[in-house]
A protein has these predicted regions:
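Alpha-helical scaffold segments that mediate packing/assembly in large oligomeric complexes
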Residues: 97-105, 112-175
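N-terminal alpha-helical "arm" segments
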Residues: 1-27
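Glycine-rich, often proline-containing surface loops adjacent to acidic residues and nearby aromatics
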Residues: 81-96, 151-153, 188-191
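Sequence/fold signature of self-assembling virion shell proteins
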Residues: 2-10, 143-182, 188-193, 199-301
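Assembly/oligomerization interface modules of large self-assembling protein complexes
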Residues: 25-83
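An acidic- and aromatic-residue-enriched active-site/binding cleft used to recognize and process polar
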Residues: 90-94, 115, 122, 126-130, ...
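Short, well-structured alpha-helical interface segments that form or flank functional binding sites
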Residues: 82, 97, 101, 105, ...
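Short, charged/polar micro-motifs that form catalytic or ligand-binding hotspots
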Residues: 43, 73, 77, 92-107, ...
């Protein structure tokens, strides 16, 4: 259905002082604070988690050396989606509008819609991260207290869900440092950045920026700050839906990823019979994760 003069009645008459509702600032590219972006040239991308060897053992004199097997643990797949939106304007609506170039106005609105869809899809990886209906390559949700590995269960979620505070933050950092690889070997892993909804920005500011402990009369230092435990600080994501869930991105490679299959593009064409002009925006991409060790989370208490 095309935008016609009947939908733009006031714009056909003189005396209108202002048009408003499409000039708001928008939140752009917040996904880049969470996901590592790579390009893709195929319908989907797959990444395989490798399982190496267990810890080496003592070889007694004269006894054969132990052999171990390496294998593939699981495969993470990113299937690209096509995101698109279009609108049409009648020839008469373009001709009779008295105030601005109507096509320019709505192509900007189209760009806002495309950007909003991308940010929602990106944030949904975290929004659905505690939901067992949305699983990754290992068959479990992104955040779990029992990711199954050859060397035993490993967690990237607090054992007891907790709101963001000094105690829960320190426990999360301890748990991150205690993670192991698929064979149970210790790995060097650290938190790099906290990701929070807008509701937690004041709590995060106090926890991350004050030099002394928050909410206590003790003259103790703020250990997380003085030790530089989260060097990139915190970022607010306005598309997170759980007001008390919080997350810590780690320095594990191949964690959360965004594959760009086709950058956003726009097309315009006229219809000879009706005179309508059609505008379309289109983009292809995917969001997901390969190694769940790339992020740690708590759904809040």
């Amino acid at each position: 259905m095309a935008i016609s003069r009947s939908q733009l009645v006031k714009e056909l008459e003189p005396g209108l002082n202002a048009l408003f509702g499409l000039e708001y600032d928008r939140y752009d590219n917040q996904h880049t604070e969470i996901f590592d972006t790579e390009n893709s040239d195929r319908a989907f991308e797959e990444e395989v988690m490798l399982s190496g060897f267990g810890s080496a053992s003592v070889k007694p004199e004269g006894v054969s050396v132990d052999f171990d097997d390496a294998t593939e643990a699981f495969t993470a797949r990113y299937t690209h989606e096509t995101i698109a939106l279009a609108f049409a304007i009648t020839e008469e609506a373009v001709e009779d509008n008295l105030y601005d170039k109507i096509s320019s106005r709505y192509t900007k609105a189209l760009a806002r819609s495309m950007m909003n869809a991308k940010q929602v899809k990106a944030a949904n990886v975290l929004n659905r991260g505690f939901n067992s209906s949305y699983t990754g390559g290992d068959g479990l949700e992104l955040f779990s207290t029992a990711h199954v590995t050859t060397g035993g269960n490993v967690k990237n979620e607090l054992t007891t869900a907790a709101d963001l505070n000094e105690t829960s933050l320190e426990q999360a950092l301890i748990d991150i440092a205690g993670m192991t690889d698929d064979r149970g070997l210790k790995i060097s892993l650290n938190g790099t950045k906290m990701i929070i909804p807008v509701n937690l920005q004041f709590t995060a500011e106090r926890l991350m920026k004050t030099s002394q402990r928050v909410g206590t009369a003790d003259n103790d230092i703020n250990a997380a700050k003085s030790m530089g435990m989260i060097p990139q600080g915190y970022v607010v994501n306005n598309f997170l839906t759980d007001t008390d869930a919080w997350f810590i991105k780690t320095d594990a490679p191949n964690g959360l990823k965004h594959f760009q299959r086709t950058p956003v593009s726009t097309k315009m064409e006229g219809d000879f019979e009706t005179g309508n002009v059609k505008y379309k925006a289109r983009e292809r991409y995917s969001f997901g994760w390969s190694d769940w060790r790339g992020i740690f989370g708590s759904p809040g208490a």
